[in-house]
Design a protein with these regions (language model features):
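Conserved catalytic core of the tyrosine transesterase superfamily
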Residues: 1-291
């Protein structure tokens, strides 16, 4: 029987449990001898399609029940934030400075790029800016008087992001070297230059981060975005201000930030459970005389 031969009345016969069992089936099933899986995100897309299908005919008064609307969307479990721990950040920056664990060939390039690499990674870790915002920086975007950089956010608007002393020192050291580099035509204003004296590309920074981070940890796949997550995590731990973190990271919707750092919120609530002591000492009555 072809699907076009089914009457619309069949839709009214479908129960909520039928759709729930369908979604459960979609978690793992076989097709052409292969196992097919769907996580919550995939099942949510399929339910959304069903909802639209049902809603169209229900709004047109061609079916009596909108059964799909009764089924809640599968709850998506956010993945744990992958980030560097504070000790790993220190090891990473130390390694960039001294070049330990680099190959002989890599060390030849390291002599030329060390100050740039230190400045770039310190900036990413110390401000949480996106890699696209980093490579888009011009020299004039850095304001040492006010300790800030002017970046171009997603959407094209400009924002000022402030940096601390470590970032300032790393940038000043690099800019002293940068003054002696003759940029390629059209790249005169670029802050970070490649060995070809051209503005660095996003892919170049991704490879740079991978090169150094792979020597620090093999259990985490560290990318420039993970350095951004590292900054956001430490800023939230320090301030406990989700709105500040959202503003600094350039999230237009604070719920985006809250979603990413939900695990830290949960950890904070668990810690709060032990913050209030019902008894000052567990043996407070032990010194009282017997009655």
């Amino acid at each position: 029987m072809e699907i076009t031969e089914f009457p619309l009345s069949v839709l009214d016969m479908v129960q909520r449990t039928d759709i729930e069992e369908y979604l459960d089936y979609m978690s793992l099933y076989q097709k052409d001898g292969k196992n097919i899986t769907n996580e919550e995100r995939g099942k949510a897309r399929k339910l959304a399609a069903l909802r639209s299908f049902y809603n169209y005919y229900f709004q047109s008064e061609r079916i009596e029940k909108n059964t799909a609307a009764l089924v809640p969307l599968p709850k998506r479990h956010e993945k744990e934030i992958i980030r560097l721990e504070p000790n790993e950040v220190a090891i990473l920056l130390d390694q960039v400075e001294d070049g330990t664990k680099l190959t002989k060939k890599e060390l030849e390039y390291h002599k030329k790029t060390k100050l740039r690499d230190v400045a770039l990674l310190t900036l990413l870790l110390g401000t949480g800016i996106r890699v696209s915002e980093c490579v888009g920086l011009d020299i004039n975007d850095v304001d040492f008087n006010n300790g800030g950089i002017k970046i171009r956010r997603k959407g094209g608007y400009e924002a000022i992001v402030y940096f601390g002393d470590e970032v300032e020192t790393a940038l000043l050291d690099y800019l002293e070297q940068r003054e002696h580099i003759i940029p390629a035509e059209g790249h005169e204003n670029a802050l970070f230059l490649s060995l070809q004296s051209r503005r660095m590309a996003v892919r170049s920074v991704e490879n740079l981060v991978k090169k150094y981070a792979s020597r620090v940890t093999t259990l985490k796949k560290i990318t420039p975005h993970k350095l951004r997550s590292t900054y956001g995590t430490e800023l939230y731990k320090e301030t406990r201000d989700i709105y500040l973190v959202a503003d600094v990271l350039g999230h237009k919707d604070v719920n985006t930030t809250r979603k990413h750092y939900a695990a830290l919120e949960e950890q904070r609530r668990r810690q709060a459970a032990n913050a209030f002591h019902l008894r000052e000492h567990s043996n407070r009555h032990s010194d009282q005389p017997d009655k």
